[in-house]
């Protein structure tokens, strides 16, 4: 049954210089996009779930490893355990929003979206023959369900480590909050907050709890519905007790001494229109998707009220998550900054096709040399995680690491994700709240 509305292009009246017409889609497209493992399991020659990939056999698995992970295993930095492919379904609310609204979505000439309400903007299978496939795919990622409508991450530990020695150089303990003002599908109000005079799409707020010298340092980011409008970002400096606006160039600086830039948050935390985007094709890759309580867990945090423990670390410098990897259908999205002075040459984002979340990111410098690796481990929300997340239909952020290959340094990120709107209301994401919380 056709779900997409047939749009007739009359060449003399509607030129390509206006908008790219919406493509019709079918229920089969929906199934393939959101339920790829219902009747199919990805395979690869020489691979069996349960295999351990190490320095001795890595060449056998090269085709199903991202380029950085292949390098690390080949160099003896880590070996990885594998497990069978499992289903990570998103909430039916998000799928239904796609059915209701995707047929009206089009691309404007500047690459922005037109008529987007909620759900997955382009549920059709991307094609390398489509010159706009990369632009469509990045919007599916940008408006994906990575944090649901509202997410709190607390506790959230960032540990700076020397890759060579494993020495812990510093540890920051955060609390983070994420809120979608529009395109909402789960929490009321849906699909948007009625009062949003700033036309904000998303708010991000973080506060440092420890160590003492950085306590109460806070960051606030407003991303706007108009993607051509630059984000606003503010930093409350705890020891100075004042708010300062971040300049545009500071989003590519190291954030609080870590291996992440603000632009790196969640894989890519910037405007779609700041990059040129290309679809690099589909491939089956080993990705860190798992059930949290089935992994080897650390003994931290201690005395958590829910009895929660972080994923543990292993490998060279203790820079790798101690988790299992599973073979999943993945889309390669290649982003190249339009600014010739940008420190990054390109981002290679490996998107999990079912959840449209970033499973790994490999960045290259302007010379074309591999620079950083940034995987995000995903835990199942219904199995082996917190009761508050059950039924939320989100592939939960569960562990991440940024390895700066050139600097020989890494930042591991261990966290407790909660999909809830108990705390996350618009008044939390204001400059006034920065001052209030910093007192």
Regions found by a protein language model. Name each.
Residues 336-421:
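C-terminal soluble interaction/assembly domains
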